[in-house]
Design a protein with these regions (language model features):
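Proteolytic maturation boundary segments
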Residues: 1-5, 157-165, 169-207
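Buried hydrophobic packing residues in well-ordered domains
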Residues: 16, 31-34, 50, 75, ...
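His/Glu-based metal-binding/catalytic segments typifying zinc-dependent metallopeptidases
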Residues: 1-43, 206-207
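A structural supersecondary motif
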Residues: 15-17, 38-79, 199
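Second-shell loop/turn segments in exported
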Residues: 17-23, 33-37, 72-82, 95-101, ...
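M16/insulysin-pitrilysin zinc metalloprotease superfamily fold
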Residues: 65-121, 189-193, 202-205
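Short acidic/His-enriched helical or mixed secondary-structure segments at domain edges of catalytic enzymes
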Residues: 1-11, 48-57, 68, 101, ...
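Solvent-exposed coil/turn segments that connect beta secondary-structure elements
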Residues: 7-9, 19-21, 39-40, 63-65, ...
């Protein structure tokens, strides 16, 4: 766990992350499908809990940024300073409980959302260029969008839960918090991940 002091800040920026599968891996698309109900929109668990239920933030999301080596998983939000610890606990508990809470409804909602989204996904020139760039960078075949559709329709609940169990473990992730050290630094030790490592704004360790 890392902390960056932003003196007198009224908000805390929270980032949670880890490295996952390499870009170009056939498992990456499956992982992105499973992530959808964790942090892929308004109806996902992070947004629903932190914004709609608790009112701690305007937004909370998680996503995968495909990379040639290992693809980073990120979950993030900006919350009111006085609920920093409470928000961190929500991130931890939602991520750790995601595999067991994931159900058939989650999977079907995700499938319908992504299938419908594909109808409009490549209407813009920029989207087509991005698709070609992705194909070139990761060596995807011309049929990779079709292949993704087939994977999407075939993935089952047991496989989705197995993917979540393998990849979403907050106890093995990095937590980075930027906020007011004076009021929040001691509190967040209650999260159970030990004393935070202090960094400056450039990411250098402060002794």
């Amino acid at each position: 766990m890392f902390f960056i002091d932003i003196p007198d800040s009224k908000q805390s920026a929270i980032s949670v992350g880890t490295l996952t599968v390499p870009g170009g891996s056939p498992e990456l698309f499956k992982l992105s499908v499973v992530n959808n109900r964790l942090g892929g929109g308004m109806e996902a668990r992070l947004m629903r809990t932190l914004r709609l239920e608790k009112g701690y933030t305007y937004g909370a999301r998680s996503f995968l940024r495909e990379n040639t080596f290992q693809t980073p998983f990120y979950a993030y939000s900006q919350v009111r300073s006085n609920v920093t610890l409470e928000s961190l606990k929500i991130f931890r508990d939602i991520i750790n409980g995601y595999a067991e809470s994931y159900n058939n409804q989650d999977l079907e909602i995700t499938k319908n959302k992504l299938i419908k989204g594909n109808a409009l996904r490549f209407e813009r020139l920029a989207s087509l260029i991005n698709m070609l760039d992705t194909m070139s960078k990761f060596g995807y075949p011309d049929t990779y969008i079709q292949n993704e559709q087939e994977v999407l329709t075939s993935i089952g609940l047991d496989e989705a839960r197995s993917i979540a169990r393998l990849n979403f473990n907050a106890n093995k992730m990095y937590f980075v918090i930027a906020g007011d050290a004076k009021t929040q630094l001691n509190r967040i030790e209650e999260l159970g991940y030990g004393k935070p490592i202090i960094l400056d704004r450039e990411g250098n360790k402060i002794n």
